UniProtKB/Swiss-Prot annotation:
The gene is proB. Its EC number is 2.7.2.11. It comes from Alkaliphilus metalliredigens (strain QYMF). ATP binds at K15, S174, D175, T216, G217, G218, I219, A220, T221, K222. Signal peptide: none annotated. One of its GO terms (cellular component) is cytosol. InterPro entries: AceGlu_kinase-like_sf, Asp/Glu/Uridylate_kinase, G5K_ProB, Glu/AcGlu_kinase, Glu_5kinase, Glu_5kinase/COase_Synthase, Glutamate_5-kinase_CS. GO terms for molecular function: ATP binding; glutamate 5-kinase activity. Catalyzes the transfer of a phosphate group to glutamate to form L-glutamate 5-phosphate. This is Glutamate 5-kinase. Keywords: Amino-acid biosynthesis, ATP-binding, Cytoplasm, Kinase, Nucleotide-binding, Proline biosynthesis, Transferase.
Length: 264
């Protein structure tokens, strides 16, 4: 089922969460990025188009300037993101450069999606970049985002991007295999929910936990993202980005994940 869904999808948004992107010590997992770029290039050669929504600016900032890691002042947090965003994009650039593929940075806030003119500019830029073979890499603009204009998490940003680009599929990479009936890190008997037809019914049957360690989104935000794209008729896959060659394994049907089916 997953392989069929990916096979028939041309326009794919991939969201990479902080926990997926980071090593256990909090640094950027550059091996993951290298592996991901190889898989994306392979699928691009088969006619697929990609937009990436990537967390990780703060992680990259901490890796670069660790002495600010424990500072709680918002100014320092935003400054870390400003430093880290440069490092993050450089890591992506280095991964795609051997294939002569360019990347483009897009930093957005909620205001950009709320204003019709800005929203149109986002859409036009996305279409232009992708049509010209460039891979857009999107993140929230943390350096200017205060509470009033924050999108809040990149699961939501990925859903907004998916809808505005009219994508065929959203894939969220996290550090778990999908949605479970209860937290698999705390319960060995947790059962993976592989196919979700009705999100409201799902919520009656599962336990929704808290936010993750590095990022701002937990299972609740992933379910909200699924609902947002499903309402536009777009399916979503939640999969474990920590697994080796996960994108190709999903395509081959050799890894399990959760599919949120779009309503008919």
């Amino acid at each position: 089922m997953i392989e069929e869904l990916i096979n028939k999808s041309k326009k794919i948004v991939i969201k990479i969460g902080s926990n997926t992107l980071s090593n256990d010590n909090g640094t950027i997992n550059k091996n993951f990025l290298k592996e991901l770029s190889e898989q994306i290039i392979y699928l691009r050669d088969k006619g697929k188009q990609f937009v990436i929504v990537s967390s990780g600016a703060r992680i990259a900032g901490v890796s670069t300037l660790g002495k600010w890691m424990r500072k709680e002042d918002m100014n320092y947090k935003q400054a870390l993101c400003a430093i880290g965003q440069v490092e993050l994009m450089d890591a992506y650039r280095r991964c795609f450069e051997p294939y002569n593929v360019f990347i483009a940075q897009m930093l957005l806030t909620r205001d950009d999606f709320s204003d019709a003119h800005r929203r149109l500019n986002i859409r036009n830029t996305l279409f232009t970049l992708v049509d010209e073979g460039v891979i857009p890499i999107i993140n929230e603009n943390d350096t200017v985002s205060v509470e009033e204009i924050r999108i809040g998490d990149n699961d939501t940003l990925a859903a907004l991007t998916t809808n505005i680009w009219n994508a065929d599929l959203l894939i969220l990479f996290s550090d778990i295999d999908g949605i479970y009936d209860k937290n698999p890190k705390e319960h060995e008997d947790a059962i993976l929910v592989e196919n979700v037809m009705n999100i409201d019914e799902l919520l009656e049957k599962i336990e929704v936990g808290d936010v993750n360690e590095f990022g701002t989104g937990g299972i609740a935000t992933k379910i909200e993202a699924a609902k947002a794209v499903n309402d536009y008729g777009i399916p979503m896959i939640l999969a474990n980005g920590k697994k080796e060659n996960i994108l190709l394994k999903l395509l081959e049907g050799t890894e399990k994940a959760t599919i949120f089916q779009a309503g008919k």
